[in-house]
Amino acid sequence: MKVRPSVKRMCDSCKIVKRRGRVMVICINPKHKQRQGK
């Protein structure tokens, strides 16, 4: 899980979702998991 100030899709299977008020990227590739920090 990468924590970044700005999250972007890294491939076509990445999906941007909002969970508990945080923007996250979920993907079939575990390296592409991201969460938006403060």
Curated annotation (Swiss-Prot):
Keyword field contains Cell membrane: no
Q: Does the keyword Ribosomal protein apply?
A: yes
Q: Which residues, by range, are in coiled-coil regions?
A: none
Instruction: Name the InterPro entries on file.
Output: Ribosomal_bL36, Ribosomal_bL36_sp
Q: Which UniProt keywords apply?
A: Ribonucleoprotein, Ribosomal protein
Its Gene Ontology cellular component terms are:
cytoplasm; ribonucleoprotein complex; ribosome
Q: Which GO terms describe its biological process?
A: translation
Q: Which cysteines share a disulfide bond?
A: none
Q: Which domain of life is it from?
A: Bacteria
A Pfam match = Ribosomal_L36
Gene Ontology molecular functions: structural constituent of ribosome
Q: Provide the family line.
A: Belongs to the bacterial ribosomal protein bL36 family.
Q: What is the name of the protein in this document?
A: Large ribosomal subunit protein bL36
Native organism: Limosilactobacillus fermentum (strain NBRC 3956 / LMG 18251) (Lactobacillus fermentum)
